[in-house]
Amino acid sequence: MDSRLQEIRERQKLRRQLLAQQLGAESADSIGAVLNSKDEQREIAETRETCRASYDTSAPNSKRKCLDEGETDEDKVEEYKDELEMQQEEENLPYEEEIYKDSSTFLKGTQSLNPHNDYCQHFVDTGHRPQNFIRDVGLADRFEEYPKLRELIRLKDELIAKSNTPPMYLQADIEAFDIRELTPKFDVILLEPPLEEYYRETGITANEKCWTWDDIMKLEIDEIAAPRSFIFLWCGSGEGLDLGRVCLRKWGYRRCEDICWIKTNKNNPGKTKTLDPKAVFQRTKEHCLMGIKGTVKRSTDGDFIHANVDIDLIITEEPEIGNIEKPVEIFHIIEHFCLGRRRLHLFGRDSTIRPGWLTVGPTLTNSNYNAETYASYFSAPNSYLTGCTEEIERLRPKSPPPKSKSDRGGGAPRGGGRGGTSAGRGRERNRSNFRGERGGFRGGRGGTHRGGFTPR
């Protein structure tokens, strides 16, 4: 808590220093002397109104400056002529164009000691992107204030580490390699193709073959996907948003989520160094489309998926120019969500080899994949699932139970006749002498049933 408070104070101090620099104040403590108070603004407005009234010849005499004692009309006319001449001389002065120096004119809330955070203008002035100021984006501190979620993530990571298969990898040219040789069928497929868009933005020559979307569509992903499975496709931030959806439909998937990678530039603030010639804005994000195949419901298929554990945003520092690697957090999102152990990563690299995954890519430097050995990890019934503990099941977010027709009214049948102890409109009262809203027995005064006798 103390470190968090210290961080807030340091940011506040930095904002006051920037504001003092923009307003021309000597220090952050002298900002109040530079800013005008409400009374001073009112005096300035009254002075301006008085000057306008004195220059306006059509204004009534009551709004003009009163004549001093002994002043004649001729003196007044001469004085007014002098004022008009001075005004005309000022208008004839050459026009001086104002040069933009800082954003003090555009700051919001400058009449207070704590101006509002205008992150867009701050980006124009300093080059710091607005997403730089989002707190608790790392995996370590994201759930610091949510102890149940933090415990859930810890337990799931331990279970995943125990159930992971040894890492396997295969160096292969995916364009020439028949991916149907990969067995068995996979529960999760992650595609990270080296799109032309990545190198077009950086302006650096690619050290591997760039893939077009026509090439990606030719992959027979549907032949290696399990009947119920998920796919994650990195598609950039341009034309891939539309063409990636076309690929999912061709392979038999339905798009269900769009995971967005937001890139910060805390370590290297400034404008984007390289711009895509086909882009309209500076692109600071990438998209990963998620598709679902088969019938998977989060309310009934808790043995295969755990929904709502992670969010659909990844916020990390932008990699160096020419580095097209994706954040490692995408693996955590996939492993936390899908409990299937048969995971395939296409277009992987040496840096992405990971326990529990089969990595295939042309840039890998070695191979250890054996189809029989890999298939033996899933030979037992339901061995393709990681399983779940009672504690994880208790902590994980769940869908609300479905409402049946019998639960619609609270337990009692609708109608129930117009008499008897079950009468009423489906509202069950937790009382032994419940009388329905309509019908039922009514006795006189007294007795256990307000009549003193047992009803017929």
Swiss-Prot record:
Residues 245-254, 297-298 are annotated as: Positively charged region required for RNA-binding. PROSITE patterns: MT_A70, SAM_MTA70L_2. This is N(6)-adenosine-methyltransferase non-catalytic subunit METTL14. Belongs to the MT-A70-like family. Its main location: nucleus. The record marks Y146, D242, R245, R298, S399 as: Interaction with METTL3. It is found in: Nucleus. One of its GO terms (cellular component) is nucleoplasm. Heterodimer; heterodimerizes with METTL3 to form an antiparallel heterodimer that constitutes an active methyltransferase. Component of the WMM complex, a N6-methyltransferase complex composed of a catalytic subcomplex, named MAC, and of an associated subcomplex, named MACOM. The MAC subcomplex is composed of METTL3 and METTL14. The MACOM subcomplex is composed of WTAP, ZC3H13, CBLL1/HAKAI, VIRMA, and, in some cases of RBM15 (RBM15 or RBM15B). Residues 135-136, 237-238, 255-258, 278-287, 308-312 are annotated as: Interaction with METTL3. Residues 409-423, 441-450 have a biased composition (Gly residues). Expressed in testis. Highly expressed in radial glial cells during embryonic cortical neurogenesis. Residues 425-440 have a biased composition (Basic and acidic residues). The keyword Transmembrane helix does not apply. GO terms for biological process: forebrain radial glial cell differentiation; gliogenesis; mRNA destabilization; mRNA modification; mRNA processing; mRNA splicing, via spliceosome; mRNA stabilization; negative regulation of hematopoietic progenitor cell differentiation. Pfam families: MT-A70 (PF05063). The modification Phosphoserine is found at S399. It comes from Mus musculus (Mouse).
